[in-house]
């Protein structure tokens, strides 16, 4: 990969986008951005607080604005929020401005990775099981992830290092 193209990681919460993104950026000597962290940095509050005060719609507006700004940069790795692909505008921009990598994971893996995390607003449910919420999100979002993915990586039990090097190999042939 001689020219440093933007790399955009998409997928559901708990897929490993932030972790893989940081390691991938480090290996490729690229700048790393996490859209949720950028929102928190710019607002001074965490994502859960924004959801509580502004609702999901308010959060999505902020997310769309920040992602639109970040993807104008060159030679970056961006880990997007799981719901960012709900915006047609964001899907179009991601597709046209870099390589989109979908980190596909099962609901079972998501449950393991998210069960102790109280910072995920969509999982703060009263009368619904977290598994049901994740299954519903997957039903609606997985087709959107698939529709814009240039590369799909099935997240399994491989190490972070193995996944990162696999992605780099795929990018070199892309």
Swiss-Prot record:
Q: Name the residues that bind substrate.
A: 36, 60, 82, 141
Show the stretches that span the lipid bilayer: none
* UniProt keywords, alphabetically: Amino-acid biosynthesis, Aromatic amino acid biosynthesis, ATP-binding, Cytoplasm, Kinase, Magnesium, Metal-binding, Nucleotide-binding, Transferase
Q: Which InterPro entries match?
A: P-loop_NTPase, Shikimate/glucono_kinase, Shikimate_kinase/TSH1, Shikimate_kinase_CS
GO CC term, one of those recorded: cytosol
One of its Pfam families is SKI
- Tell me which residues bind ATP: 14-19, 120, 158
Q: Which Gene3D superfamilies match?
A: P-loop containing nucleotide triphosphate hydrolases (3.40.50.300)
Top EC class, one word:
transferase
One Gene Ontology term from the biological process aspect of the record:
amino acid biosynthetic process
Looking up CDD domains in the UniProt record yields:
SK (cd00464)
Quote the record's cofactor note.
Answer: Binds 1 Mg(2+) ion per subunit.
Q: Which residues form the signal peptide?
A: none
**Known EC number(s)?**
2.7.1.71
Q: Which reaction does it catalyse?
A: shikimate + ATP = 3-phosphoshikimate + ADP + H(+)
Q: Where in the cell is it found?
A: Cytoplasm
Q: What is its main location?
A: cytoplasm
Required cofactors, per record? Mg(2+)
The residues that hold Mg(2+) are 18
Domain of life of the source: Bacteria
PANTHER family referenced in this protein's UniProt entry, alphabetically: SHIKIMATE KINASE (PTHR21087), SHIKIMATE KINASE 1, CHLOROPLASTIC (PTHR21087:SF16)
- Record text on subunit structure and interactions: Monomer.
So what family is this one in? Belongs to the shikimate kinase family.
Instruction: Tell me the function of this protein.
Output: Catalyzes the specific phosphorylation of the 3-hydroxyl group of shikimic acid using ATP as a cosubstrate.
User: What is the recorded name of this protein?
Assistant: Shikimate kinase
Species lineage, top-down? Answer: Bacteria, Pseudomonadati, Pseudomonadota, Gammaproteobacteria, Enterobacterales
């Amino acid at each position: 990969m001689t020219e440093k193209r933007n790399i955009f990681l998409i997928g559901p919460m708990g897929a490993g986008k932030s972790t893989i993104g940081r390691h991938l950026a480090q290996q490729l000597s690229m700048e790393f951005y996490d859209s949720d962290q950028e929102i928190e940095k710019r607002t001074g509050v965490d994502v859960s607080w924004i959801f509580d005060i502004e609702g999901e719609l308010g959060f999505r507006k902020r997310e769309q604005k920040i992602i639109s700004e970040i993807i104008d940069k060159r030679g970056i790795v961006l880990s997007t929020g799981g719901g960012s692909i709900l915006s047609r505008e964001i899907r179009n921009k991601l597709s046209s401005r870099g390589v989109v990598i979908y980190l596909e994971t099962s609901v079972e893996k998501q449950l393991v990775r998210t069960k102790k995390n109280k910072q995920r607003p969509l999982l703060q449910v009263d009368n619904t099981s977290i598994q049901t919420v994740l299954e519903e999100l997957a039903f609606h979002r997985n087709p959107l992830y698939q529709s814009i993915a240039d590369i799909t990586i099935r997240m399994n039990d491989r190490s972070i290092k193995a996944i990162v090097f696999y992605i780099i190999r795929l990018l070199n042939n892309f």
